């Protein structure tokens, strides 16, 4: 009887773990971006970060969001915008996609590829190949499975997908560069008292 109870307990724990996993990754922290286009406020984006699944990548993003202008995300641009694909930012050193750096040094290794690009509204690290993560990131505006296993997914939009869409639809110059500067006017960290799961699906 004891052995049967042990087996039942193990199965129950396994079922709970699977159920939790089925709900999706857990948000442990939030970061906000107050956005401007051409100097005019367009709203706030709030991003949930998965600090248990990708702690090193999430911490890098949080710390860069907390830094002052010129040392992190505040004042930096979304320098590359492609409709029906993604919006890319985070190059706070050069502003054109050739710069940026992490809190760990110039670059850091890919943490893992446990999460995928499930649809619009997922946050992932931009890179120049394997193990070249710095500060640049992108937010998907469609499902992008061809990026799975190549870019580290570490967050999801919780609020402000309409702001992401405004950025996506902004007028562009050759090279996918916005005609008017798309600026993170302010950014910061929002603590999460109790981590919560998000679905593995697109943000509407």
From Swiss-Prot:
Glycosylation sites: 133
GO MF entries: cyclosporin A binding; peptidyl-prolyl cis-trans isomerase activity
Tissue localization of expression: Embryonic, larval and adult gut cells.
Physiological role: PPIases accelerate the folding of proteins. It catalyzes the cis-trans isomerization of proline imidic peptide bonds in oligopeptides.
Gene Ontology BP terms: protein folding
KW S-adenosyl-L-methionine (keyword) present: no
Annotated compartments: Cytoplasm
Catalytic activity: [protein]-peptidylproline (omega=180) = [protein]-peptidylproline (omega=0)
UniProt xrefs under InterPro entries: Cyclophilin-like_dom_sf (IPR029000), Cyclophilin-type_PPIase (IPR024936), Cyclophilin-type_PPIase_CS (IPR020892), Cyclophilin-type_PPIase_dom (IPR002130)
Organism of this sequence: Caenorhabditis elegans
UniProtKB keywords: Cytoplasm, Glycoprotein, Isomerase, Rotamase, Signal
Protein name: Peptidyl-prolyl cis-trans isomerase 5
UniProt cross-references to SUPFAM superfamilies, sorted A to Z: Cyclophilin-like (SSF50891)
Induction comment: Inhibited by cyclosporin.
Family (UniProt): Belongs to the cyclophilin-type PPIase family.
Signal peptide: 1-22
Top class in the EC scheme: isomerase
Ranges for domain PPIase cyclophilin-type: 32-189
GO-annotated cellular components: cytoplasm; intracellular membrane-bounded organelle
Keyword Isomerase: yes
EC code(s) of this entry: 5.2.1.8
């Amino acid at each position: 009887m004891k052995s049967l109870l042990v087996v039942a307990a193990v199965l129950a724990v396994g079922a709970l773990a699977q159920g939790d996993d089925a709900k999706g990754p857990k948000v442990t922290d939030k970061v906000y971006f107050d956005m401007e286009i051409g100097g005019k406020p367009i709203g706030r984006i709030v991003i949930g970060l998965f600090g248990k699944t990708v702690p090193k990548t999430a911490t890098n993003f949080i710390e860069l969001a907390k830094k002052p202008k010129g040392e992190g995300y505040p004042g930096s641009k979304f320098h590359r915008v492609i409709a029906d694909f993604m919006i890319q930012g985070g190059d706070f050193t050069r502003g054109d996609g050739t710069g940026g750096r992490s809190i760990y040094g110039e670059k850091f290794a890919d943490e893992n590829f446990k999460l995928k690009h499930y649809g619009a509204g997922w946050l992932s690290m931009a890179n120049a190949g394997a193990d070249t993560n710095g500060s640049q990131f992108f937010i998907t505006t469609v499902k992008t499975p061809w990026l799975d296993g190549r870019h580290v997914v570490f967050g999801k939009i919780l609020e402000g997908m309409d702001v992401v869409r405004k950025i996506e639809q902004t007028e562009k110059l050759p090279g996918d560069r916005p005609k008017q500067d798309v600026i993170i006017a302010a950014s910061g960290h929002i603590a999460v008292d109790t981590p919560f799961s998000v679905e593995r699906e697109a943000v509407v």
